[in-house]
Amino acid sequence: MAKLTKRMRVIREKVDATKQYDINEAIALLKELATAKFNESVDVAVNLGIDARKSDQNVRGATVLPHGTGRSVRVAVFTQGPNAEAAKAAGAELVGMEDLADQIKKGEMNFDVVIASPDAMRVVGQLGQVLGPRGLMPNPKVGTVTPNVAEAVKNAKAGQVRYRNDKNGIIHTTIGKVDFDADKLKENLEALLVALKKAKPSQAKGVYIKKVSISTTMGAGVAVDQAGLSASAN
């Protein structure tokens, strides 16, 4: 049996795995236990009452968190003409068509998000094997294929998170950094849960949001009591 590190022993002593914590208590606990030498992300896992084996019950989308994620995001946009100028004005680092595709084919991928206008998908389609495995392929379901590329760039820069359930029906994403004020982390979590509720498949039956847990990059998960969240989020 592997020996527990001092850090993990402390976490096990502090976190009751059988308890659901009030959101404020949960955030305070994460902050107390975040002893890594970098500013850890605060991540969330949401267990959904869906059958992930059925395509009509899968949940996928994007939402802009009110206080962002604390990450700086580099954006690449496939578009042309007036849209190209609008994308640059909105803050996109890379804008182009075939020239941008050629850069990517050479392995030059210094970006975190890819956005495309519909007319550019003929070019982006050639990059599916490169962008797809990295989760970067533009998709209208998450707002990254859109005629309004400038708005999409602004959303990405403002702290938009994309979400998609895994094979176990769990959503994993980030809601900020551990140095965020507790209120900001709480409001970001509530905004995410509101978005997930709006994305509930009509075929999903029973309890939809079954469990919510938050953790830091290097920490253990802390289960959150949804009763302590705003009415619209629980």
Swiss-Prot record:
Pfam name, any one: Ribosomal_L1
Keyword Ion transport: no
Record-linked InterPro entries: Ribosom_uL1_bac-type (IPR005878), Ribosomal_uL1 (IPR002143), Ribosomal_uL1-like (IPR023674), Ribosomal_uL1/biogenesis (IPR028364), Ribosomal_uL1_3-a/b-sand (IPR016095), Ribosomal_uL1_CS (IPR023673)
Domain of life: Bacteria
Source organism (scientific name): Salmonella typhimurium (strain LT2 / SGSC1412 / ATCC 700720)
Function recorded in the entry: Binds directly to 23S rRNA. The L1 stalk is quite mobile in the ribosome, and is involved in E site tRNA release. Protein L1 is also a translational repressor protein, it controls the translation of the L11 operon by binding to its mRNA.
A GO cellular component entry from the record: cytosolic large ribosomal subunit
Annotated keywords: Repressor, Ribonucleoprotein, Ribosomal protein, RNA-binding, rRNA-binding, Translation regulation, tRNA-binding
Quaternary assembly: Part of the 50S ribosomal subunit.
Recorded family membership: Belongs to the universal ribosomal protein uL1 family.
One GO MF term attached to the UniProt entry: structural constituent of ribosome
Gene Ontology biological process: regulation of translation; translation
Name of the featured protein: Large ribosomal subunit protein uL1
